[in-house]
């Protein structure tokens, strides 16, 4: 386990070889994490990310972070620990003691390389300056970038004015189609009452022929 009183910059010095070997595969993710934490600026990130050699990229990154102070070194070690997919528990740099977490960036560590001033246009050592890139480009690049005439802003302003009504028309929401009310269901017709059955007529009584015969017999007698 590492020394709890050891500074993060001293830990980087002691474990520099292992850091360079281990962080090469995930150097891009490490750069992203350092930019998100504010350790690296945008130009520094672009300059380091443009280096094709991963080993050289990590070496430059360690030097650049050490020049920013102990707080930046502590952030680098923390990001490296989170970035490495399979950390080795025997590595001492993963057990750096707390003490620099909430501090602002300190002045450069003594005995380490200090980056040049921002006015020089160089973000990392060994990278070409902006003036050198312009010289390399030659007169062809300078001719390609022509100064803008004062008439161009007026044309652009007119074009933007002409586009404003179109933008307003596009921003207006389209009216929603009216939803037709659903027709109410028609009431079901009530069933007609069944007609009452008519009473059957009573059968007529047949005349009693026997009584007539008897009366006729009596008269004959």
From Swiss-Prot:
BP GO terms, sorted: blood vessel remodeling; cardiac muscle cell apoptotic process; cellular response to hydrogen peroxide; cellular response to hypoxia; intrinsic apoptotic signaling pathway; mRNA splice site recognition; myoblast differentiation; negative regulation of apoptotic process
Stretches for region Essential for interaction with BAX: 20-70
One of the record's GO cellular component terms: sarcoplasm
InterPro entries in the record: Apoptosis_Repressor_CARD (IPR052685), CARD (IPR001315), DEATH-like_dom_sf (IPR011029)
SUPFAM superfamilies listed in its UniProt record: DEATH domain
Bilayer disposition of the protein: Lipid-anchor
Subcellular location: Cytoplasm; Mitochondrion; Sarcoplasmic reticulum; Membrane
Record note on modification: Phosphorylation at Thr-149 is required for its antiapoptotic effect by blocking death-inducing signaling complex (DISC) activity through the control of interaction with CASP8. Phosphorylation at Thr-149 results in translocation to mitochondria and this translocation enables the binding to CASP8. Dephosphorylated at Thr-149 by calcineurin; doesn't inhibit the association between FADD and CASP8 and the consequent apoptosis.
Keyword line: Calcium, Cytoplasm, Lipoprotein, Membrane, Metal-binding, Mitochondrion, mRNA processing, Myristate, Phosphoprotein, Sarcoplasmic reticulum, Ubl conjugation
Residues found modified as Phosphothreonine: 149
Lipidation (N-myristoyl glycine): 2
GO molecular function annotation: calcium ion binding; caspase binding; cysteine-type endopeptidase inhibitor activity; cysteine-type endopeptidase inhibitor activity involved in apoptotic process; death effector domain binding; death receptor binding; identical protein binding; kinase binding
Annotated Pfam families: CARD
Primary localisation category: cytoplasm
Organism superkingdom: Eukaryota
CARD domain boundaries: 4-95
Domain remark in the UniProt entry: CARD is critical for both extrinsic and intrinsic apoptotic pathways. CARD domain mediates a protective effect against myocardial ischemia/reperfusion, oxidative stress and TNF-induced necrosis. The C-terminal domain (amino acids 99 to 221) is involved in calcium binding and plays a protective role in calcium-mediated cell death.
Quaternary structure note: Oligomerizes (via CARD doamin). Interacts (via CARD domain) with CASP2; inhibits CASP2 activity in a phosphorylation-dependent manner. Interacts with CASP8; decreases CASP8 activity in a mitochondria localization- and phosphorylation-dependent manner and this interaction is dissociated by calcium. Interacts with TFPT; translocates NOL3 into the nucleus and negatively regulated TFPT-induced cell death.
Entry function: Apoptosis repressor that blocks multiple modes of cell death. Inhibits extrinsic apoptotic pathways through two different ways. Firstly by interacting with FAS and FADD upon FAS activation blocking death-inducing signaling complex (DISC) assembly. Secondly by interacting with CASP8 in a mitochondria localization- and phosphorylation-dependent manner, limiting the amount of soluble CASP8 available for DISC-mediated activation.
Protein name: Nucleolar protein 3
Organism: Rattus norvegicus (Rat)
